[in-house]
Each structure stands twice: as C-alpha cells, then as structure tokens.
C-alpha cells in the first residue's frame, strides 16, 4: 500500500467511559491503531474531542455541564489531562506528539491560516504526530461547531490529506435511525453527499458530544470539495485504521474517485475569508471568469459597493445580483471606482502596480 496522508477524527463518544470521563482503554486502543498507521509509513494527523469529557469530573460536576462557562471551565482543565494521556500512550511507540489548539478565527485570518499550514507541514516532515483540538476554553463557536467534525474536514483540506476518517459510536450512515428501526439500511459507499442524504441525518448529538450525524455528513461534503475522500464509522483493535485504508472499515465510505486538490490560498478564500466588499460585473466579464477561467479586468466592472482595501476579499455579482464567486482584490474600493469600465491600456499606472487585473484567476473561487 502506498504511503498516504491521513486525518483521523475521534469524537467524545469514542473516548468516554460509562461515567462520561475519558476511558483509558479506549484511548489506548485508538493510539495503538494510529501507531500502526505510522508503522506502515503513513503520515497521520489526529483531531480529537474530549477536553470537556476529560475535565468535568475533576471540577466536581456530576455530569457534562450544560452552561457555556461550565463547558469552557471543564475544557480548560480537561485539555491538559487529555494531551497528557495521549502523549504518554504515544511515547510507548516512540512517537513524538505536538499539540495545536485552533479556533475559527485562526482560519479566517490569512496570516494565522498560513502559519498553521506551515507548522503542520513541518511537523509531518519531522515525523511528528500533530494532535489538534478546538480551543474549547475560549471559543464559543466550538460548542456548536459539530464536535470537531467540520474542523477535521478543514484540516484535511489544509494538509492535502488522502483520506479523512471520522470515528464515532455508529458504524456508518443509515437511511433510518438503526437504534429505532430494525429495517434500517446501511450505506456502505456513497459517491457524493446529496441533499437527500443530508436530509436523512438529524441534528442531535450524543450525550457526551455535540456532533450528530448531520455534522459528519456536512464535514464529508466539505472534505470532498477539497479533494479528500472520507470514511465515517467505528472499529476496535490495532488494525482498525489500516483496515479503513484497505477498504475493510466498519462504516460508510464517501467518495473514492480522485478529486482535484484545491490550493491552500483558494481554500482560504472559499471557506474562511471574510468578505469586505462587493463588485458588480457585466455579462461578458461573468462569462470570461466562470466559463473561460479568466481574470477580472476593470473593463468588466460596472459597480463597486462598500469600502475595502487592497488585498481584501470581495464577492462578485452579476448585474442581476447573483453571486458568482469571490476573490482577493488588487485594487482598493476607491481606486476601483476611478477605473471601473476602463480598458487596461487607458488606465494610468499608479505607484508600483504591475498588473491591471482586479482579481487574478489564481486568487478567485467560483461559487
């Protein structure tokens, strides 16, 4: 089997014991299986939930807290306990671990996003195993983020993973709730995530986690759009992750055809960037951008809305108001208002400008 880069997401329900705390047995089982992947030469990134589950009992809570401050306090205590447990287990296999705590804002800010990309790349090049969790103790978004499901999809795209494995307490996707319907049909393979598939999943998570099956399906859809195949399921034993790569996993495989990898810069524009303004274009410009992959030139711009600076992301709309995409603008709003509708040869070069493109095709994403 060729060497692959794999992102494994382990949810709270796959780590917890009967009392809601972290099960040493389950954690050891996961680590042994991850070590097997490394032994076979694969590169591994672990996305782990469980900080709240690891910490709530230490603070005297009888069960997982329901208030935001309770969850964040439990996460602050539990994250160090969780990381300590992982580090000690991986040390038995001679594997060096690294901790990264991320928030949504780390993805929306280009510099921090690029730093995360560079750090993960260096860790993998050095054969370390990055362990990533949402920074639960300060991030409100995490507590409704889907139990790290979407985070795992975004990270899998960021590191250009070959596969994302989302491990949970259910062995795949079904057309009905298998716990309530004996005739529930399991999906062993789905070529894509359709609206019909999305509608089958409920929003509710387990008592120990915040993510239901819908968040996993949404994560799978995002990962597929970034060129990453997905597995959603469960398993036990040292071979469980290796078996997933061999096509023998106990769950559902989603998308296995080679996908076109989305470059890091375009991932950031498409999924994380904040839109600072809007540019309206004529029909000719819209066709050139969407159908022919051209850059946007000033001649095609018909209107500029809101104030934005050079390098900020703007959305582009047709004269009918339909959003066709977004990209990084090489002009400020003030500059663009002065040159909109003009041919490139008629525009006086300002300052150090070396290009007349409003949005270069390398910094554009169609929606």
UniProtKB/Swiss-Prot annotation:
Keyword ATP-binding: yes
Cellular-component GO terms for this entry: cytosol
GO MF, any single term: RNA binding
GO biological process, one term: proline biosynthetic process
Annotated metabolic or biological route of this protein: Amino-acid biosynthesis; L-proline biosynthesis; L-glutamate 5-semialdehyde from L-glutamate: step 1/2
Location(s), subcellular: Cytoplasm
Residues reported in the UniProt entry to bind ATP: 9, 168-169, 210-216
Keywords: Amino-acid biosynthesis, ATP-binding, Cytoplasm, Kinase, Nucleotide-binding, Proline biosynthesis, Transferase
Enzyme Commission numbers on file: 2.7.2.11
Annotated PUA domain residues: 276-350
Covalent S-S links between cysteines: none
Residues involved in substrate binding: 49, 136, 148
Pfam families hit by this protein: AA_kinase, PUA
Function: Catalyzes the transfer of a phosphate group to glutamate to form L-glutamate 5-phosphate.
Similarity-based family: Belongs to the glutamate 5-kinase family.
HAMAP family from the UniProt entry: ProB (MF_00456)
Name of the protein described by the UniProt record: Glutamate 5-kinase
Organism: Bacillus cereus (strain ATCC 14579 / DSM 31 / CCUG 7414 / JCM 2152 / NBRC 15305 / NCIMB 9373 / NCTC 2599 / NRRL B-3711)
Gene symbol of the encoding locus: proB
């Amino acid at each position: 089997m060729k060497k692959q880069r794999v992102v494994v997401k382990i949810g709270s329900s796959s780590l917890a014991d009967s009392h809601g705390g972290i099960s040493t047995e389950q954690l050891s089982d996961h680590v042994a299986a991850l070590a097997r992947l490394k032994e076979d030469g694969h590169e591994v990134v672990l996305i782990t939930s469980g900080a709240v589950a690891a910490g709530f009992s230490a603070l005297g809570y009888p069960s997982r807290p329901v208030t935001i401050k309770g969850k964040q306090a439990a996460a602050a205590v539990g994250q160090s306990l969780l990381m300590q447990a992982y580090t000690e287990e991986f040390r038995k296999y001679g594997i060096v671990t690294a901790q990264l705590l991320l928030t949504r804002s780390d993805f929306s800010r280009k510099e921090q996003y690029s730093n995360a990309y560079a750090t993960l790349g260096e860790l993998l090049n050095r054969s370390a195993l990055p362990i990533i969790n949402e920074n639960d103790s300060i991030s409100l978004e995490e507590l409704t983020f889907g139990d790290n499901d979407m985070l795992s999809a975004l990270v899998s795209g960021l590191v250009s993973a070959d596969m994302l494995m989302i491990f949970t307490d259910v062995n795949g996707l079904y057309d009905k709730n298998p716990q309530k319907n004996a005739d529930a049909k399991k999906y062993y393979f789905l070529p894509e995530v359709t609206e019909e598939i999305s509608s089958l999943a409920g929003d509710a998570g387990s008592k120990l986690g915040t993510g239901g099956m819908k968040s996993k399906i949404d994560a799978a859809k995002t990962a597929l759009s970034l060129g990453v195949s997905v597995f959603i399921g469960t398993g036990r034993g040292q071979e469980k992750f290796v078996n997933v790569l061999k096509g023998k996993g106990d769950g559902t495989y989603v998308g296995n055809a080679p996908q076109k990898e989305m470059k890091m810069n375009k991932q950031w524009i498409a999924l994380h960037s904040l839109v600072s303004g809007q540019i309206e274009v004529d029909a000719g410009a819209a066709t050139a951008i969407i159908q022919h992959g051209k850059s946007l030139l000033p001649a095609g711009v018909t209107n500029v809305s809101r104030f934005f600076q050079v390098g900020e992301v703007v959305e582009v709309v047709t004269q009918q108001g339909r959003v066709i995409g977004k990209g990084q603008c090489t002009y400020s709003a003030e500059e663009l208002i002065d040159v909109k509708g003009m041919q490139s040869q008629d525009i006086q070069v300002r300052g150090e400008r070396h290009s007349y493109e409003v949005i270069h095709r390398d910094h554009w994403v169609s929606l």
